[in-house]
Amino acid sequence: MREPDFLNHFLKKGYFKKHAKAVLALSGGLDSMFLFKVLSTYQKELEIELILAHVNHKQRIESDWEEKELRKLAAEAELPIYISNFSGEFSEARARNFRYDFFQEVMKKTGATALVTAHHADDQVETILMRLIRGTRLRYLSGIKEKQVVGEIEIIRPFLHFQKKDFPSIFHFEDTSNQENHYFRNRIRNSYLPELEKENPRFRDAILGIGNEILDYDLAIAELSNNINVEDLQQLFSYSESTQRVLLQTYLNRFPDLNLTKAQFAEVQQILKSKSQYRHPIKNGYELIKEYQQFQICKISPQADEEEDEFVLHYQNQVAYQGYLFSFGLPLEGESIQQIPVSRETSIHIRHRKTGDVLIQNGHRKKLRRLFIDLKIPMEKRNSALIIEQFGEIVSILGIATNNLSKKTKNDIMNTVLYIEKIDR
């Protein structure tokens, strides 16, 4: 394909109609270098001001030389370029988060409203297959979106309908680490896909077709349920369990950066069914608020965050909090380590007591206020006591009492341990 063909596609799709400034994520690979060439050549036709952004991951000897070459390229094209260096322990997830945080900083600094990436159809196939193998939710198998609004910016992926073989061979940098199978995506690209294509030579097309079909269903359900107020629990619970799940998943699409896991989604469902009033952080700066027959999910305001005085601990993580070291699923060594059976399926909330708190003991629900009175706990200790909560229920009041589930229930639900060590403040 020729460059004008790509321009015509961009114009037909109207990718940049709403944008005057766009930031291009420039890695130096063939796909991003060709996208740079098309966008820089046709800035006038597309009516955009182009800004370049590059992250030097510092993982290869060639990285610094490539950075210098990209600076030269930007200077020759008379385009601004912003560069940041990755630091810390490297992983695919950390590098991705670092890149997108940096790109958003560049956009704020320059006033750009669009972030353009060079993801193409081959990336889409790899992404869908990765998510399928990991067992992600069905709606995420639609893959990467062509256009995606996140807050006040729009991410545009104009190459998503093209394969890498559609791009002409132009000057670019080859990342030799892509040939290694250390990372999951590389194993998908180098090993799994070639084997699957032996069984079905059109396997890539089949995967893309499934992704598009799931996207169609997702959009259709959103349109058909547009007049249903999912936040009205009386209305939501009037439908079958299956329909409730689908409606709730569609509702969660309103929050693209929330990304609940299956276990977290199940936890939200359980809270909506079992709690009359509830207010807790759930993930990525969002909180779930339930008041009788109504609920909502919204961003936590700084004031609300301070009032909650709460920490959320995820599986395989540790945190020092209020004089204790909490380790979720990672054993601690020592003679004074407290161990509490918990589930690895969802996060743990560590907080202070709230009005209406209840602990289940011997199958009976007991208000914390009454428990503290019965145990003659001093007021100062009541106010400083740390509550450990999971699945919306109190698991333990640290150093005071625990939820003594039956042995069978413990075996069924509790499949890991929260380790707690007293430390100097």
UniProtKB/Swiss-Prot annotation:
Pfam families, A to Z: ATP_bind_3, TilS_C
Keyword terms, alphabetized: ATP-binding, Cytoplasm, Ligase, Nucleotide-binding, tRNA processing
UniProt xrefs under InterPro entries: Lysidine-tRNA-synth_C, Rossmann-like_a/b/a_fold, TilS/TtcA_N, tRNA_Ile_lys_synt, tRNA_Ile_lys_synt_N
Record keyword tRNA processing present: yes
Gene Ontology terms: cellular component: cytoplasm
Binding site residues for ATP: S27, G28, G29, L30, D31, S32
Catalytic reaction annotation: cytidine(34) in tRNA(Ile2) + L-lysine + ATP = lysidine(34) in tRNA(Ile2) + AMP + diphosphate + H(+)
EC number: 6.3.4.19
BP terms from Gene Ontology: tRNA modification
MF terms in GO: ATP binding; tRNA(Ile)-lysidine synthase activity
Taxonomy, superkingdom: Bacteria
Subcellular location as annotated: Cytoplasm
Annotated function: Ligates lysine onto the cytidine present at position 34 of the AUA codon-specific tRNA(Ile) that contains the anticodon CAU, in an ATP-dependent manner. Cytidine is converted to lysidine, thus changing the amino acid specificity of the tRNA from methionine to isoleucine.
HAMAP family, per database record: tRNA_Ile_lys_synt (MF_01161)
Comment text on domains: The N-terminal region contains the highly conserved SGGXDS motif, predicted to be a P-loop motif involved in ATP binding.
Annotated family: Belongs to the tRNA(Ile)-lysidine synthase family.
Protein name from the UniProt record: tRNA(Ile)-lysidine synthase
Organism: Streptococcus pneumoniae (strain Hungary19A-6)
Gene this protein is translated from: tilS
